[in-house]
Swiss-Prot record:
InterPro entries: Ribosomal_L11_MeTrfase_PrmA, Ribosomal_PrmA_MeTrfase, SAM-dependent_MTases_sf. GO terms for cellular component: cytoplasm. Belongs to the methyltransferase superfamily. PrmA family. It is found in: Cytoplasm. S-adenosyl-L-methionine binds at residues 158, 179, 201, 244. This is Ribosomal protein L11 methyltransferase. The lineage of its organism: Bacteria, Bacillati, Bacillota, Bacilli, Lactobacillales. Methylates ribosomal protein L11. It comes from Streptococcus thermophilus (strain ATCC BAA-491 / LMD-9). One of its GO terms (biological process) is methylation. Gene3D superfamilies: Vaccinia Virus protein VP39.
């Protein structure tokens, strides 16, 4: 049995994914997320009665560190990086950080009880890597290790990205995944029939984690992962470019995306809070794209833009 140190932060729901990434990048071995919205969404799934739960606007994210980690220094670094999120227009709310030691707690195994297989779209189900799961006819399985980094793939921004990929992929496409994180969108693209997938992330941790997740899923030799800063220096053309990152970063890839997307190809963007949606749409349309689909889940937005001269199938066309 090992000793672990626990750091719990409470922040506004809109920064859940960014805050989780900050904790992972600070050396956490994994995170768990306590969100009342998830409880309420799933509470009546089996027709059972549950205690009343009030949905609040904050989430609690708990990160776990080895006993040897300098938790005081980590706490300071995490707090500083959370403060920086306001530079991207994100409101963290009143940040609350609490630390404690878990005595003789083998968290490396115990935390797994929080994660179960989740059907995300009509075809795609995300399954924790340690779980035996028998797929139904037509069901496509994505094996992930949520303890590595970047959550479980069930965040609204990821869900909408997966829905969009199902919408546009028909088989044989080349896909570029910008800011790949866990690699979930690349794995999904392969399962949905893409021929070649190129996944980029600026963070070396993400590149490693993505590759490890990809290796867990058979038949993913068509996914190529590399360190990259958005689309800078990329010359490979693509039928689809997908990016699930912050809105203030998305706007800086729209011109390069238009250069790389083939005629009649698509740009999928997610991770956009509602107040930033108009800005992202303006930048994409300025680059030359036409809006085909706009999705909203809570305060999050996702979109599918098309590189086309045919306005009949686009919004406003």
């Amino acid at each position: 049995m090992n000793k672990w140190q626990e750091l719990t932060i409470e922040v506004n729901r809109e920064v859940e994914e960014a805050a989780s990434n900050i904790l992972i990048e600070s050396g956490s071995q994994g995170v768990t997320i306590d969100d009342s919205a998830d409880y309420l969404e799933n509470a009546d799934r089996f027709g059972e009665l549950y205690p009343e739960v009030e949905q609040v606007e904050t989430v609690k994210i708990t990160a776990y560190y080895p006993e040897s980690a300098d938790i005081e220094d980590i706490t300071k670094q995490v707090n500083d990086r959370l403060d920086e999120l306001t530079d991207f227009g994100l409101e963290t709310g009143d940040i609350n950080l609490v630390t404690q030691e878990l005595v003789e707690e083998d968290w490396a195994e115990n935390w797994k009880k929080y994660y179960e297989p989740a059907r995300i779209t009509h075809d795609l189900t995300i399954v924790p890597s340690w779980t035996d799961y028998e797929a139904s006819v037509g069901e496509k399985i994505i094996k992930l290790d949520p303890g590595m980094a970047f959550g479980t793939g069930t965040h609204p921004t990821t869900k909408m990205s997966l829905f969009a990929l199902e919408q546009v992929l028909r088989g044989g496409e080349t896909v570029i995944d910008v800011g790949t994180g866990s690699g979930v969108l690349s794995i999904a693209s392969s399962l949905l029939g893409a021929k070649e997938i190129y996944a980029y992330d600026l963070d070396d941790v993400a590149v490693r984690v993505a590759q490890e997740n990809i290796d867990m899923n058979p038949g993913m030799e068509n996914i190529h992962v590399a360190t990259g800063d958005l689309l800078k220096g990329v010359t490979q053309e693509a039928d689809v470019i997908v990016a699930n990152i912050l809105a203030d970063i998305l706007i800086h890839l729209t011109e390069d995306a238009y250069r790389l997307v083939k005629d009649e190809g698509y740009l999928i963007m997610s991770g956009i809070i509602s107040e930033k949606w108009d800005m992202v749409r303006e930048w994409a349309e300025k680059a030359g794209f036409l809006l085909e689909t706009h999705m909203v889940q809570g305060e999050w937005n996702a979109c599918v833009f098309k590189k086309t001269d045919d306005i009949s199938g686009v919004i406003g066309g």
